[in-house]
Amino acid sequence: MNYAYLIYQIKDMNTDYAFMGWNFAKDRINLMDYDGVYYGRSIDGENPIAVLEKLFERFNVNHPDDFKGHSMSVSDIVVLFDDNGCKWYYCDRFDWKDITADLRGRR
C-alpha cells in the first residue's frame, strides 16, 4: 500500500514534553506547539508501522535535502494518509503510538 505522510516536530525545544515519551506527553500535547516540517508521497509498506520504521530510518540516516527539521526523534508526530483517510502516530521511546483517537477535539 502507498502512503503519503506529514511529519510534525515541536517548534520550541523548551516545551516541557519535547523529546519525552507518550506517557509523559499524552496529557500535555498541544498541536499548536508543532510545525509541519515535511510532506512526502509514495512511501510503500505492508502496514503503517513498517512505513513509520522506514520513515524513521530515512529521516535519521539519509534525509531529503529539502528537509528542514531535526532528525526524527521521540515526541515527533507523523500523519499517514492512505485511501481510507489518515492516522496520527507519536514517536515514543521504543515504538509508535496510534494517537488518532487521543487527538480528537484537541487543538
Locate predicted features:
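Extended boundary segments
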Residues: 1-46
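Broad hydrophobic/π-residue packing in well-ordered secondary structure
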Residues: 2, 6-10, 52, 89, ...
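Short intrinsically disordered coil segments
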Residues: 22, 106-107
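Short, conserved turn/kink motifs that form compact alpha/beta structural patches or helix kinks used as
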Residues: 31-81
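Short, compact, well-ordered microdomains
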Residues: 68-106
